[in-house]
Amino acid sequence: MAIIDGIALAAATKAEAAQKVQALREKGVVPCLAVVQVGENPASQVYVRGKVNDCAECGIESRSIHMAETATQDEVLAQVRALAADASVHGILVQLPLPAQINEKAVINAIPPEKDVDGFSPVNVGRMQIGEPCYLPCTPAGCIRMIESTGTDICGQNAVVIGRSNMVGKPAAMLLLEKNATVTICHSKTKNLREICAAADILVAAVGRAGFVTGDMVKPGAVVIDVGINRGADGKLHGDVDFAAAAEKAAFITPVPGGVGPMTRAMLMLNTVQAAARQNGLAYRKTLQPVEIAHFQSIFIGGHVPTMKIPLESKIAFESPSGMRT
């Protein structure tokens, strides 16, 4: 069993973004991400700080707009529309959840598709469903990159996604389907859940219940991606997967913390850079130079630590954009 190191993979992904930022800056384009937070949710504050730090690491300009808990929907919409009209802002992210008086869908819908770097707007969701150019939701896109980092060929694999949320479960299933996996989506009404999961070559857990996936639900040799982030009574973060039990059977597994979370933010950086390029009539023509980093941690002391090759761009040129899919 090997742990997929999301921190190392995210670092390589952000290095890729930083190279693209440098190339854009040489063209006079400074990528900019605006993050709108409404209220004092402690978790949201942590997430926003993380995104601001990631931007700084990649050379992306960031704007953090913090609105009062009592802000009205009209005030939030006005802020989003102002950012939408600002040509120097290339990506807009509204940190969720929002206070009860604000309609989240209305706010997300107000973000122009070309600046929707979270990939949540109806236009981007619809484009993804039919395979058209779009910005992919960051968490599902990060999951795909993590699976592929193991050397697993997704094509033809039996993939099971537990959870059908609009932000993770459904888009993760669509991206796996696009990679030619045979996909099953499981949810609270699914019968024979244990048997279905135990047949999965790729198992993505996004149900929001700590330890929901037990060892007997994991097929020997499977790739297990744990999207869950649950705060336990001990104050620690726990995933949706019983890590110790699943690790005995999986070939590859993501930890919590240090797995999917860092990759979500890294994919946001890539989407933001791509948005800046697109909005300035530029797209990347890539010359790829693989860079090796250690990304798996063997749980066996003294065990072999495999490496992966992340294709970073040794040269970046520009051409007219043909689509936004990343």
Language model region names:
Residues 13-19, 23, 27-29, 33, ...:
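Adenosine-phosphate binding glycine-rich loop
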Residues 75-87:
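Short, well-structured alpha-helical segments in soluble
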Residues 38-52, 134-219, 223, 241:
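Glycine-rich phosphate/diphosphate-binding loop of Rossmann-like nucleotide-binding domains
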Residues 55-69, 183-185:
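Short beta-strand elements in bilobed, periplasmic/extracellular small-molecule ligand-binding domains
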Residues 93-154:
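Anion-binding alpha/beta catalytic cores of soluble intermediary-metabolism enzymes, centered on
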Residues 298, 314-316, 320-326:
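Low-acidity, Ser/Thr- and Arg-rich intrinsically disordered low-complexity segments
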